[in-house]
Amino acid sequence: MIRQQPDGVQTQIAQDLGSDPTLVLHRPAFCLSSMRDQPAIGLHPVSDPDVVYSFHFYEPSELTALAAYRPGLDRAALARVPFPSDDAGCRAAADSAADDATRGLMAFVCSMHWDAARVGARIERAAAWGRDHDVPVLLGEFGATRALNAPARLAWLEVVRRACEQRGVGWALWGYDDSMGFGVDPHAARRPAPGGGVSGRSVMDRATLSALGLGAVE
């Protein structure tokens, strides 16, 4: 989508909406959908309730994805980093690390003091962009790996969710039944069901649902 020329994008939006009045279009608000990047170059948002501009949020990825971009780290130690950040928890996690590279990365992450205020400031950037252009904004992806310590993961999910809701930004968790999503067991839906076939059902993690402000899902 973002490779299209701006005029072509606008023309395509008009054509898509004209072809189906029930259609809701999602367009990236930022290059590569990440708020680490600049707003999509040449994008002139269409102020239409059926066009929603989305972005992704996984910051800091050293926490939410345990720095998956960097091989050779002690991820078991990295998974102990706290959220919200606190000095004592960071020191304890660093002391457990097996190598200097992991300790250095931990020091970098902890020095940024990620907490509700910092997350809120990042989400506010997208919310402000939407207000400035009078368009709806959606956090179309966010999540944290289940390998992260549970208190940090659940706190991060709740903080991001609340930051969105406080600013009128819609949100959608990354996955349904994978390690960054709602499910306890990513293979549950594919297990054999009584009488043949597969169950087609995933077991929802109640703690995750609670962090997201959702009730029990049967």
Label each region the model flagged.
Residues 103, 110-111, 121, 127-128, ...:
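Aromatic- and carboxylate-lined catalytic core of secreted/periplasmic carbohydrate-active enzymes
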Residues 1, 5-9, 111-122, 152-156, ...:
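Soluble or luminal CAZymes and related metallo-dependent hydrolases
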Residues 1-113, 124-144, 166-167:
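Active-site region of glycoside hydrolase catalytic domains
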Residues 148-218:
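Aromatic-rich peripheral "rim/lid" segments of glycoside hydrolase catalytic domains that contact
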